[in-house]
């Protein structure tokens, strides 16, 4: 029988000092035999996805205490990728994932907490907490802040839906008037919550459902809706049950590594491909799998991407649907239900509610459930009122979207495409693979060949795009922006958005060893591995080299002979200490970022730290 971890600090005469300090936090004698549960919050006023989380930790804590546990809350950092985008701040985004994971480990292990409730929401916070949860392997439930309502405004006598990406594109488009750009900017992000499309934050919160670590509705129920409060209340109750199951009944099935098994990771990736999720999810799932000591690699993702269709298309791949529409169509369980009927899921997995996948679908899939309360929950909709308050409205759609032929979520027979929303490409400068979000690629450019325009920083590429130096047919190559080379693997949302602004969204390709925002669409290929700074062949590409992209055949090729590539590699190595570094880039890199770069691996490994360098 496992012993409560917290007993280390609450039992025995030698722990009198620790108990004295616990008493100073409000604990009494009656509390010293109870499980101590960490409420891991991420409230900050910097991030709209987290601005409403201040009081939600207290909600969870009250339920933990009522159920017989002791709740102790702490906070992690949270970086807003949208605000950090397009300047030096983006260097810090991905490294913050490791800091978040480490900070959770530090707090939980230093104080011997028995379990956790993780209150996350945005791009690197959910992955960081997920990595920590699987590293620590103590009972955990995730409950995120929820998606933002889609923005809406009237343009050309039509009401259109908006999000952050629209504001960026319109702001950079010289054909758009100042008045219209201002109107879109003021309408794009109307409420608290994670940005309203299938961007990285919402993709990851959906994947926690598929991994079994969060409750039904977590990924799609709006941040502003009153129904979301139940997820927080239930999380507080349920974590105490999970904790007692493990420590008092010796039931290891309550542990996250046994819930988020390899089968669950495969289901999560299957969901991601089917819903056209962010390419960043590949990075984060690979990293989380390593923390869980699961053999889940790019090869597994490649195999899944070849057989899973796209059943859901959401902004930024279309402006017709946002997360509020996914929820109305049944949310994550609606998509999983269609995948299950297509025979594409592992059915033996369980979730934090203790339900198997078939049991979960029977209760929560809107296409089969007989539960009116579940149907009511999935009719929770937007209010269209600007607010930063959680649970501030209770509007509902009159009906569910159960149209699986032409609705937001489709059945296998009516799939948006037989190929899924993500694909892994391989070639002679991406030997370990690269990722493209096919959900956002126009059919006309699934095969594309063009001359390279090479840039050794995102800033130089943006200047060239806005300066008219990139023209129709070009393949923009941005390198030395990987985990080590950036450092920090910047997102390239500005270059892709500006290509659209210049009318080149369907006329050019962009390739990088950096990554893309979940808001990116177009022929945008990222995560090229090995990265330039690690000796990858992307460092050998020169202006004018022809590059051939063939998504249907999962191929990407630099059209040079092996002999020419070898000669360029020899020339690069001859640079000595300057080999595999940018030639003409001025970038100030802090000590903290240099420390990150010294251990960073390429994207095909999840951009995690290289344990071998630490003797691990």
UniProtKB/Swiss-Prot annotation:
Residues reported to bind [2Fe-2S] cluster: 122, 195
Task: List the record's Gene Ontology CC terms alphabetically.
Answer: cytosol
Output one GO BP term. Answer: L-valine biosynthetic process
For this protein, what is the EC number? 4.2.1.9
Q: Which domain of life is it from?
A: Bacteria
- Keyword annotations from UniProtKB, A to Z: 2Fe-2S, Amino-acid biosynthesis, Branched-chain amino acid biosynthesis, Iron, Iron-sulfur, Lyase, Magnesium, Metal-binding
A GO molecular function term, named singly, is: dihydroxy-acid dehydratase activity
Q: Which InterPro entries match?
A: Dihydro-acid_dehy_C, DihydroxyA_deHydtase, DiOHA_6PGluconate_deHydtase_CS, ILV_EDD_C, ILV_EDD_N, IlvD/EDD_N
Keyword Secreted listed: no
Pathway it acts in?
Amino-acid biosynthesis; L-isoleucine biosynthesis; L-isoleucine from 2-oxobutanoate: step 3/4; Amino-acid biosynthesis; L-valine biosynthesis; L-valine from pyruvate: step 3/4
User: Could you give the cofactor binding note from the entry?
Assistant: Binds 1 [2Fe-2S] cluster per subunit. This cluster acts as a Lewis acid cofactor.
Query: One Pfam family, short name please?
Result: ILV_EDD_C
What reactions does this protein catalyze?
A: (2R)-2,3-dihydroxy-3-methylbutanoate = 3-methyl-2-oxobutanoate + H2O; (2R,3R)-2,3-dihydroxy-3-methylpentanoate = (S)-3-methyl-2-oxopentanoate + H2O
Q: How does it assemble?
A: Homodimer.
Annotated family:
Belongs to the IlvD/Edd family.
PANTHER family annotated for this entry?
A: D-XYLONATE DEHYDRATASE, D-XYLONATE DEHYDRATASE YAGF-RELATED
Q: What does this protein do?
A: Functions in the biosynthesis of branched-chain amino acids. Catalyzes the dehydration of (2R,3R)-2,3-dihydroxy-3-methylpentanoate (2,3-dihydroxy-3-methylvalerate) into 2-oxo-3-methylpentanoate (2-oxo-3-methylvalerate) and of (2R)-2,3-dihydroxy-3-methylbutanoate (2,3-dihydroxyisovalerate) into 2-oxo-3-methylbutanoate (2-oxoisovalerate), the penultimate precursor to L-isoleucine and L-valine, respectively.
Q: What is this protein called?
A: Dihydroxy-acid dehydratase
Gene from which this protein is expressed = ilvD
